[in-house]
Regions:
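Post-cleavage N-terminal segment of exported redox proteins
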Residues: 1-40, 63-106, 278, 297-298, ...
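Outer membrane beta-barrel
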Residues: 62-66, 98-114, 119-252, 265-281, ...
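C-terminal beta-signal and adjacent terminal beta-strands/loops
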Residues: 415-419, 423-442
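Outer-membrane beta-barrel "beta-signal"
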Residues: 53, 417, 443-457
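The canonical Cys-X-X-Cys-His
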Residues: 51-61
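Outer-membrane beta-barrel and related beta-rich outer-membrane complex signature
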Residues: 192-200, 254-256, 298-300, 339-343, ...
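Detector for outer-membrane/organellar transmembrane beta-barrel domains
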Residues: 281-407, 411, 423
């Protein structure tokens, strides 16, 4: 399922603070709300719990402010509301419970127009809902919080578990503030604080009615909702962030991974390191992240396919003309040792590589309008076994090269409602600009216009 609902992360999560510095964080949130004119916004349960509108945590959803990142870092438990508590009871029990409901929902609807309709399908496909999600999120105890999502996906009629991130967060006292915690989650990078890594990167919404490129690194959602990750993280002095996690296959709908599930051999390590700094009102983050996974493609013994992904990313934020510019970029390189696929005759070479580049910038003049433009590129080894000739989704020359741009205009009549128009244009698709699939389809035939509505409540 396409991961979309970062907004609801802050709209619906209840919090209680383990931090003595809670007053400072709340003052920061009120400052962001005031700066973005959000004093009287009517929003879902995040506002009910804190008295703050979406703009405390988002320039516009889904793009987080510094306070939004603090909220997630501290385990979804920050609040300024009184809790239902019991301390040192006679039977040894204790309780810290948010009085607010932790239930919220999200609905998206869309219309998709392709430059040239797919064979034997109707163009201008409409979806209502495209996705319908229910969220259970917020404070579990004073130091434990959760974000969890159940999603009905209209295009395939399925309903199941979506993103989950369960966190424990605490801090140390002293001259150098340190936040540390543990995350238990089901999608690599769902726990990330920035809008550069795969789960929360732009575009924040897409469509299943348009074809997608044949190749992407494993970190681009290959294990989304089908792996269980356990990791530890820390933020030192608000400057250096580090995380190390390990993932093991946890296939939805299976009690244990079977031979055809693409199970991880053992565990797959994931790492994250970032340096952030504010220069006056300007913010900059530089980071790196990566993962190594050995996967059984068809059987649970014998040769595996090994993937090593290493990425670098950056995020830049600065006020301009009463609004905000946010720029995000990432480059992710993957080395592939495909012993299992090569032995099965499905790859021409056992050693391949793949690289993706994504860069985009948004301008938010106020809380109602947003403009975003981005560029994307995928390149890699030519291999007619991995990328064979096939109508629409194949490659005539065995190359994964795909290039293009995305533009999006958003109008938010309320902070929890969005009407958007998104256009994706391709210069290359699966290795070519003309007749890329060997069946006469051009890259520009896949150019896509997406009209959508997005509500969180």
């Amino acid at each position: 399922m396409r991961a979309t609902p970062w907004l609801v992360l802050t709209l619906l999560s209840g919090f209680s603070s383990p931090l003595p510095a809670m007053d400072d964080l709340y003052d920061l949130a009120r400052g962001y709300a005031a700066a973005h004119g959000a004093g009287h916004g009517a929003v879902p349960s995040y506002a009910r719990q804190t008295g703050l509108a979406c703009s405390a945590c988002h320039y516009q959803f889904l793009t987080l402010t510094p306070f939004g990142r603090e909220f997630k870092l501290n385990g979804y438990v920050l609040t300024n509301r009184p809790l239902i508590t019991e301390k040192d009871s006679t039977n040894g029990g204790s309780l810290d419970l948010s009085p607010a409901s932790l239930v919220s929902a999200m609905l998206t609807a869309s219309m998709t127009h392709l430059n040239d309709a797919l064979p034997d399908t109707q163009n201008d496909a409409v979806a209502l809902p495209q996705e319908l999600s229910v969220f259970l999120a917020g404070q579990i105890s004073s130091k434990v919080g959760i974000f969890s999502q159940l999603t009905y996906a209209g295009p395939d009629g399925s309903f199941g578990i979506d993103n989950v991130d369960l966190r424990y967060a605490n801090h140390t006292s002293g001259d150098t503030p340190v936040v540390y915690g543990v995350t238990l989650n089901n999608s690599p990078s769902v726990q990330d604080l920035w809008n550069t890594t795969p789960v929360w990167g732009f575009p924040f919404i897409g469509t299943d009615a348009a074809p997608g490129p044949a190749a992407s690194p494993i970190l681009d959602d290959a294990f989304a909702q089908n792996a269980l990750g356990l990791g530890a993280y820390t933020m030192i002095n608000g400057l250096i962030y580090g995380e190390f996690s390990v993932y093991r296959s946890a296939i939805q709908g299976q009690a244990a991974p079977d031979a055809e599930s693409g199970a991880i051999d053992g565990v797959a390590p994931y790492w994250r390191l970032a340096l952030q700094k504010e220069f006056g009102h300007t913010y900059l983050m530089l980071g790196t992240y990566g993962m190594h996974a050995s996967v059984f493609p068809d059987v649970l013994s014998g040769p595996t396919n090994a993937y090593t992904d290493i990425g670098v990313d950056a995020q830049f934020e600065t006020p301009v003309g009463g609004g905000e510019i946010v720029a995000r970029g990432t480059w992710l390189h993957e080395d592939q040792t495909l012993d299992a696929t090569f032995d099965a005759g499905d790859a021409n070479s056992a050693n391949n590589d793949l690289s993706t580049l994504r860069f985009n910038a948004s301008y938010y003049p106020n809380q109602r309008f947003g403009l975003t433009a981005g560029y994307f590129q995928t390149t890699g080894s030519t291999d007619t076994g991995l990328y064979p000739v096939d109508p629409v989704e194949g490659s005539a020359n065995g190359s994964p090269k795909t290039t293009g741009f995305i533009g999006e205009v958003d109008y938010d009549p309320w902070e929890n409602v969005r009407l958007g128009l998104q256009y994706t244009g391709y210069g290359n698709f699966n290795g070519g600009s003309t007749d890329y699939d060997g069946s006469g389809r051009d890259a520009s035939d896949n150019n896509t216009l997406l009209l959508f509505a997005w509500l969180a409540f």
